[in-house]
């Protein structure tokens, strides 16, 4: 699902990571761990295309949809909470919006275009989008009574829950989540664990919550010593199987995995010199 080849990121003389070649697969959830400042968020940004690497490539299937939870993104306070969550499925949201505008327009209706939009909506289970968005919002403890209220109704922490809901509602193939448990209580964390446990795509998750990583992730990516090491198992399993070297989340260094590559003519690859 995501392949990196000889990926590197440097800031001047400082090397965050180099020569990183990984294959991250659908159906797997990867916990991204390491010291503060080690390059976890930078690696996530490179995967998302938000930041350029210094060298190497990132390859993702062209039709794959990617959802990213960023810590530095904010939503419009004037927007309706439910609408913001529904916008997470950009394909359906756009099709529903165009369908509504065509049907409300005066004059002759473009029946062909309406039929095309109907096909798009049906193919993406679009008529359940509102119900799915409501379910995710409720799972994140945003009550139904507030779903049609402006975002400004909520406190800062709950606004971030709406942002998380938007990413989860999208039905994407790849989830890149930077600290998704921030501002969540124990009940909503448990709900998120269950949601991610049933997620069929490829997920890469940054979190300082060890229990959350144990409950959710199937693999661990350790950012340390200028490289990124792929380990089998969640946080605790990876820790037990690793060499006993110091790390802020525990001893997480192991022998680097052999380089893996991917070849697929239907992929989108970003190259850096």
Give names to the regions the model predicted.
Residues 31, 247-248:
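Residue-level marker of motif borders
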């Amino acid at each position: 699902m995501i392949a990196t080849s000889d990926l590197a990121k440097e800031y001047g003389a400082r090397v965050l990571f180099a020569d990183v070649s990984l294959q991250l697969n659908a159906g797997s959830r990867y916990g991204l761990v390491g010291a503060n400042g080690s390059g976890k968020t930078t690696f996530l940004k490179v995967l998302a295309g938000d930041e350029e690497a210094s060298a190497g490539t990132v390859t993702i299937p062209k039709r794959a949809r990617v959802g990213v939870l960023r810590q530095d993104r904010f939503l419009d306070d004037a927007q309706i909470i439910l609408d913001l969550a529904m916008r997470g499925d950009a394909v359906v949201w756009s099709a529903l919006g165009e369908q509504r505008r065509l049907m409300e327009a005066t004059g002759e209706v473009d029946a062909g275009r309406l039929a095309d939009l109907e096909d798009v909506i049906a193919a993406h289970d679009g008529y359940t989008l509102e119900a799915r968005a409501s379910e995710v919002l409720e799972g994140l403890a945003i009550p139904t009574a507030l779903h049609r209220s402006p975002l400004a109704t909520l406190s800062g922490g709950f606004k971030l829950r709406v942002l998380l809901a938007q990413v989860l509602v999208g039905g994407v193939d790849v989830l890149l989540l930077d600290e998704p448990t921030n501002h969540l209580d124990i009940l909503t964390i448990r709900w998120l664990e269950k949601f991610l446990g049933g997620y069929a795509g490829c997920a890469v998750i940054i979190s300082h919550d060890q229990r959350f990583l144990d409950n959710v992730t199937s693999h661990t990516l350790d950012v340390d010593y200028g490289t990124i090491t792929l380990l089998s198992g969640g946080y605790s399993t990876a820790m037990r199987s690793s060499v006993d070297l110091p790390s802020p989340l525990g001893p997480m260094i192991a022998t680097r995995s052999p380089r893996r590559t991917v070849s697929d003519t239907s992929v989108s690859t970003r190259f850096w010199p």
